[in-house]
Amino acid sequence: EPWGLYLWWLNLNGAFYFNGAFLGDGGRFSEPIARNWNKPFFFVLPASLWKPGDNEILIRLHSDPGWGILSPIEVGPVSRLRPDFELRRFLQVDLTRGLTITLLVASTLVLAVWWRRRHDPQYFWFGLACLMWGVFSTYLVLRDPPMSGPVFRWLSHLALDAWAVCMALFVHRYLGIRRPRQEKLLGLLLVGAGTLTALPALIWQGYAFMVTHTLTFMIIAWQALRVFGHWRKGRWREHGLLGIALGALLLAGLHDLLLALPLDNLPSELARIRLKYHFILLHLAAPIVLLFLTGHLGRRFADALYDAETLNRELESRVEA
């Protein structure tokens, strides 16, 4: 049975060699570097390349300064390694790409509804939230960005912070809350996040992202508490589904924050498990939750149209009478 080489993930790009023979790579090594940080690699090791005794695997790793990382590799029978590789690639690349496209279409539809109902800004903020997550998701699946890598990374992470702000403003409109000072503060936080992460000379960008994304998590938690407060008043049908959705985002976000903590002193076996398990849950949870809420808003919109048409018919019948 043929053997293969399986790499869980790396940052940002790599070229693979076996006993001096080229196996493949992830694309361009010049700027903008091909971005393969969210995909696994798998190569079959041809029987003709094996030799008695020691065999050499060489991986050329290329990344932006400070961002390079290489997970442990697995070498073994193809029948054992390929299923795990295929599942990981499906979840991290194929499914994420499909959800991103679907979410961008959904954001267009929601914004189109807002254009017809501009007196109801909840559709605007929710459509913009879907759009911001769609922009961030392109960072997960787009290998060759149309701009420099550092700029692409900065814009994508800023879109993630903007997503949280838009979600907060959507929740405010959904619940009928008006908090002008708090909403201005959210805008200032977004400006501050963009400024902090754009100054790598002041603080390493990875640490800056951890700070801003922790604030993102706190914003979502804040809105979940607000929805829970309204739900306790007995308005389950209106607020229960939104509360469940925000709760799912909170759990996924907490998982990802814990996964991103710099735990350098872990025992080697635990560190190996952590590297292999490095699966960002919010990448799947957020678009699924947003699509779920899109359907929920669509139902509310249809109910509102039905009620309006029913009222118009009743008024017309009274006028005719």
Task: Mark where each language-model region is.
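Aromatic-lined ligand-binding clefts that engage carbohydrates, nucleic acids, or primary amines
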Residues: 1-19, 57-59
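Solvent-exposed beta-strand/loop surfaces of large extracellular or lumenal domains
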Residues: 21-41
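Non-catalytic regulatory/interaction regions at protein termini and inter-domain linkers
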Residues: 24-26, 58, 64-79, 102-105, ...
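An acidic-aromatic loop/edge-strand motif
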Residues: 38-98
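First transmembrane helix
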Residues: 86-117, 210-232, 287
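Alpha-helical transmembrane signal-anchor helices
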Residues: 102-113, 290-301, 319
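Interfacial "cap-and-anchor" motif at the non-cytosolic start of specific transmembrane alpha-helices
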Residues: 132-314
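Cytosolic juxtamembrane regulatory segments of multi-pass membrane proteins
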Residues: 313-321
